[in-house]
Amino acid sequence: MITSELPVLQDSTNETTAHSDAGSELEETEVKGKRKRGRPGRPPSTNKKPRKSPGEKSRIEAGIRGAGRGRANGHPQQNGDGDPVTLFEVVKLGKSAMQSVVDDWIELYKQDRDIALLDLINFFIQCSGCRGTVRIEMFRNMQNAEIIRKMTEEFDEDSGDYPLTMPGPQWKKFRSNFCEFIGVLIRQCQYSIIYDEYMMDTVISLLTGLSDSQVRAFRHTSTLAAMKLMTALVNVALNLSIHQDNTQRQYEAERNKMIGKRANERLELLLQKRKELQENQDEIENMMNSIFKGIFVHRYRDAIAEIRAICIEEIGVWMKMYSDAFLNDSYLKYVGWTLHDRQGEVRLKCLKALQSLYTNRELFPKLELFTNRFKDRIVSMTLDKEYDVAVEAIRLVTLILHGSEEALSNEDCENVYHLVYSAHRPVAVAAGEFLHKKLFSRHDPQAEEALAKRRGRNSPNGNLIRMLVLFFLESELHEHAAYLVDSLWESSQELLKDWECMTELLLEEPVQGEEAMSDRQESALIELMVCTIRQAAEAHPPVGRGTGKRVLTAKERKTQIDDRNKLTEHFIITLPMLLSKYSADAEKVANLLQIPQYFDLEIYSTGRMEKHLDALLKQIKFVVEKHVESDVLEACSKTYSILCSEEYTIQNRVDIARSQLIDEFVDRFNHSVEDLLQEGEEADDDDIYNVLSTLKRLTSFHNAHDLTKWDLFGNCYRLLKTGIEHGAMPEQIVVQALQCSHYSILWQLVKITDGSPSKEDLLVLRKTVKSFLAVCQQCLSNVNTPVKEQAFMLLCDLLMIFSHQLMTGGREGLQPLVFNPDTGLQSELLSFVMDHVFIDQDEENQSMEGDEEDEANKIEALHKRRNLLAAFSKLIIYDIVDMHAAADIFKHYMKYYNDYGDIIKETLSKTRQIDKIQCAKTLILSLQQLFNELVQEQGPNLDRTSAHVSGIKELARRFALTFGLDQIKTREAVATLHKDGIEFAFKYQNQKGQEYPPPNLAFLEVLSEFSSKLLRQDKKTVHSYLEKFLTEQMMERREDVWLPLISYRNSLVTGGEDDRMSVNSGSSSSKTSSVRSKKGRPPLHRKRVEDESLDNTWLNRTDTMIQTPGPLPTPQLTSTVLRENSRPMGEQIQEPESEHGSEPDFLHNPQMQISWLGQPKLEDLNRKDRTGMNYMKVRAGVRHAVRGLMEEDAEPIFEDVMMSSRSQLEDMNEEFEDTMVIDLPPSRNRRERAELRPDFFDSAAIIEDDSGFGMPMF
């Protein structure tokens, strides 16, 4: 017994007699061991004692007062303070077997049911986190509403947590123990106690009142208890139904016997038993009806998502457990309506509940009407914004399809089909399982049995693979074949690994009567086949799915190795045949050449399959000679690179074949170049084609192979110089020559960095790089855009590679190879970016229309421009190009935000990390450039309200936001920015005289956007610096042309004691900055810096350095909006400790926010509604309870419960006559029966409840 319970027995001493000191030892033992079961949490004793006579009751209760410990399982249990353990603590600790705890309580109940029920009541109160305790006189003399109101006042207002919401493994275990306790309690009481018309009435009445409370903890805990209680009762009802059926069968069997063999006594016993079972069944149904109508109907619409989820989860259990009673439309509609809940966790519980029902195909007839009604909603949930909900919705749709294919229309299926291409893997896998069941699991059993003996194209998988290809083509997402394969991998792995069938479909001619595959189908099948090979060999999802490669389990690793061996052994033989058949098709060949990278190349040697390797090399050589497409040549080059890996024994054989191939191409290239250069402008198309085709092949191979010994750079350089000098070189040859020369330089650098180069080697490479950089720089002025773009990218790459970072890592000897771009080259690179990246949208659209390019080409062009900008931005970030060049990029931040905003923002962030001050000077320079351009267009008299001026100010505001919230870190940078801005504004004097404003004065209005980033002390310093440029005449001016100066001065002067961050003056400014106020805050004792020490501390610094004011204390930071402590409704609340609803409840419950605003009016309305509805009686006593733990809305309704359809409105307005409406009959032993009898299942009560907002539900 807890200490607070001691007054319970002290107050009831008038009902008991004193315990005799002369009592026997046996009596004392009994008092300690048995009668102390009246205390909460008494587990059963291992040694059973004789029951006490009624005369001993007083002595026992007196003994309880003197007892200082409790028992569990016959052993004393105490907490650290020596106080006895309560029932709540026993359940929380979970050390005792739950059945023992329940048996002990039952034993106590048989002796004194009031004391036992008091224990149980306090158990529910304490499980809600309430510190109060119900005393015996409260239990006997007070109504539930009064008890609940009293307990509400005992809540701890300091914390909003209660056991069901507390974090940690102990409290998670408590929840399961709590639910287990209730289930075991009903199970152990199911044969007698629950029918005594006292225990269950008391518990149900209490839980009904608690579930109707405004206190979340009470509602949450009591709803969980009531739902688990209902589940246990459903189990009891199910058992009773089974017993009734058995009894009825026994009765029928006995009655059908011949009269001579019939036992009349047995018939009477069976009739009596059937009658008792029927009475018990009726009693249980009354209890379930009371819980359902008194608690579930209201709480499944609760404002708290956890409470709604509990209700939906349990009703799913009832319908699955006792489908004969609960699986009907009267109960299913609650799940259907809640599919529209606004919280994902509630929708998830609905889907889980339905899945458990649709899993049983025998239940489908009972679900038919529900399926027709809510199928559209379920299908739409496959696109739920919560991925977990979407996954379960797809699984539910799959179950519906499995049970009844006619239930889903073609449109429904198509809505799920496209999800196999989702980037979220669980969604895609679930959709893949649906696709598998829909397309690959419907076969004629006889036909399938006949085909099962066949292999290859005639096997069952042959038709399925054709279906997969057709699906892939119809989806028109050919670039996502890897996603489709990954989606089907778990459900259709056997089909996807049938490479034998796939290759037979590709290689063999169709038999008579069989339709041949089209060219598109063959291309799709090859693409899918390559994706399945990749998936099997790598054993992880494709790029874009999943967070990365996970560690494979031993089983997965073994499967991966087996699959790799299987595919290697198969395609070593078939790949040369496939290449031979499709050698003329570039797309097919490029895909097929991806396969060797997934081989286990050791099998060539261990399996004695060198002849197949020779066949493969022969086919690859044939493909290289036949094709000039970049994709094909790169695939061939990569295949050679893989086969030439040094760790494999086949390396020598492949290297010889590769060298022979390169020798042929180099000889051909050298001769064709000589011919082309000799003929000059008279060269014909054949000469040009010979050079271009051979150069393309060599360039593709040079990317992955070191071809420096063939000295390709010489002839490439000759082609480039000739093209520059004479201008007649075809652009494709120039582009390929540039790329090939670039690869040659990189391979030379690799040799030098890997070895110990001589000084001569370094000088030779330096000369090569210098000459190539000069050629690239000259190409920037080429008339052909592809040439210019190629030259620009190579320039940026080489300047990055041969920058000062080349010497890092102990490679100081490479200093001769470092190149720093001169001013002229930097200017040319910047000009190229301005001309080719920041182009007008109108020009782009016109060019696209002229070239008849579609949307895909526009995206490709944008991607190319983004690469150009990123390449130049890297030069700025790595300090290869001067940072001030970034000003021309930063000024386009707003205009091209959608296209390049992320790149510019990242460049700005990186440059600030390098040098905050220089970055700030670059930002102000970009604004000055925009301002100068505007002045040139509109003249010195700018319209401050024009869109152009507003655009510059908006850009300045965006730049100011990038400085962040830490003003100490950005202090010097912001001060430098203001200094440069002031100097720019007063750089030129007005030629008309000093009485006229300087031409750039309007720039101060732009500069004022950065005033909010100045510390208060720095504002004074900046203001002092500004005044150095002002004359007395300027200070006295108030005309409109001087408004920028007035605005800027005000932004610096304001923020004295209020510490406001910025003030925008002038009629044209519509933006306001956040205001930080210190009003109402206690003063902080800190050292204040004198104003004199701040003046001119950084005014005389150089352009690149600025001295910050002396060491300053951290400024006092206040919240942007100070929370007021006043309470508008405080006068209406009597309790001094009361306050508004808890902040979490208030923030997340819009109904509370409305109700607090309209409190007086709602109070009157609520009071009338409460008096008119009997079931609101419980709340009448708690209307003015502690506000800190209450939610104003007693019956909150969430808006998204219903579907917006007329049919559901009719469903909502029906009278629910088909639901159980059996009420418990009145009895003198039933407590507060009036609270359970009213029919709150009336639809009118649901819709007209005072918790609504006065708005329609639909």
Swiss-Prot record:
Pfam families: HEAT_SCC3-SA, SCD, STAG
UniProt keywords, alphabetically: Cell cycle, Cell division, Chromosome, Chromosome partition, Isopeptide bond, Mitosis, Nucleus, Phosphoprotein, Ubl conjugation
Physiological role: Component of cohesin complex, a complex required for the cohesion of sister chromatids after DNA replication. The cohesin complex apparently forms a large proteinaceous ring within which sister chromatids can be trapped. At anaphase, the complex is cleaved and dissociates from chromatin, allowing sister chromatids to segregate. The cohesin complex may also play a role in spindle pole assembly during mitosis.
TM spans (from-to): none
Residues bearing PTM Phosphoserine: S24, S756, S1062, S1065, S1093
Compositionally biased residues, Basic residues: 1076-1087
Skewed-composition ranges (Low complexity): 1062-1075
Subunit structure: Cohesin complexes are composed of a heterodimer between a SMC1 protein (SMC1A or SMC1B) and SMC3, which are attached via their hinge domain, and RAD21 which link them at their heads, and one STAG protein (STAG1, STAG2 or STAG3). In cohesin complexes, STAG1 is mutually exclusive with STAG2 and STAG3. Interacts directly with RAD21 in cohesin complex. The cohesin complex interacts with the cohesin loading complex subunits NIPBL/Scc2 (via HEAT repeats) and MAU2/Scc4. NIPBL directly contacts all members of the complex, RAD21, SMC1A/B, SMC3 and STAG1.
GO biological process per UniProt: cell division; mitotic spindle assembly
Descriptive protein name: Cohesin subunit SA-1
Cross-link (Glycyl lysine isopeptide (Lys-Gly) (interchain with G-Cter in SUMO2)): K1161
GO cellular component, one term: nuclear body
Subcellular locations according to the entry: Nucleus; Chromosome
PTM field: Phosphorylated by PLK1. The large dissociation of cohesin from chromosome arms during prophase is partly due to its phosphorylation.
GO molecular function, one term: chromatin binding
Chain segments carrying region Disordered: 1-59, 1055-1148
